[in-house]
Amino acid sequence: MYEIEKYVNVNIGGTALLLDLLTNTPHTVRRVVVAESRAIYGEGRYWSDDLNTYVYPLERPDETMARGDFEVKYPECTKPLRLVATTEDSAIHPNSVYGITKQVQGQLVHLVCKSIGVESVSFRYQNVYGPGQSLSNPYTGILSIFSTRIKNGNGINVFEDGRETRDFVYIDDVADATILGLEAEGVSGHAFNIGTGVATDVLTVANTLKKYYGIDVPVTVSGNYRLGDIRHNFADISQARR
């Protein structure tokens, strides 16, 4: 849950302050681009062969993960769920405080901007990586954290079974997309996933970085886990490509 008050004050309070200024003071702002997050999707979208439809699993329970069973489950389904790309019209069901604040942030921007005649666009960034990323926050910057440990000759601790996946997108691509969000026509009121559309597991990330740096450090798949972490999620980016 990690720094609850900070998430609420910055993401919701800061956005409310901005919208107050846009509503109550003279300005020349034409469009607001809000940085949402893939966290609003929670576990993301899956296909159920049992139900023959898309399903949206809830948070994985502690007792299940404690047994080393890390895959998501869904009531009434006996067959394994199949991970599919998460589209912008997928269910919004964040399973973290951070995700809830990003959901509210986006809703505030679209609601208020529409009422005051300002255009709005929201970008749902996937796992962004690149220079300048924090090394102290375990919920972001896994590539930076792993890279630093490898270059210092330290081993890497991979949580769960290492097969959890994320959609990793480079910061320059995110910056380019954000600029397009400011300039493109006909996008007001819409939300776009910003990612690569590729699911990469964490163990592959660790081994790829070792190979890139040419430094052999031990990679330990520990089975440790954090409640509230998602198992998988990757974006459908077809809307952003149009």
Regions of interest found by a model, annotated:
Residues 6, 48-53, 139-141, 175, ...:
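Glycine-rich, phosphate-binding/catalytic loops in enzymes
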Residues 74-96, 118-134, 145-169, 193:
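A conserved pocket-lining segment of Rossmann-fold NAD(P)-dependent short-chain dehydrogenase/reductase
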Residues 43-48, 133-137, 205-207, 231-233:
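Short aromatic-enriched loop/helix-cap "lid" or pocket-rim segments at secondary-structure transitions
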Residues 2, 10-13, 89, 96, ...:
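Residue-level signal for the nucleotide or nucleotide-sugar donor/cofactor binding architecture
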Residues 1-126:
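N-terminal Rossmann-like NAD(P)+-binding domain of SDR-like oxidoreductases, especially those catalyzing
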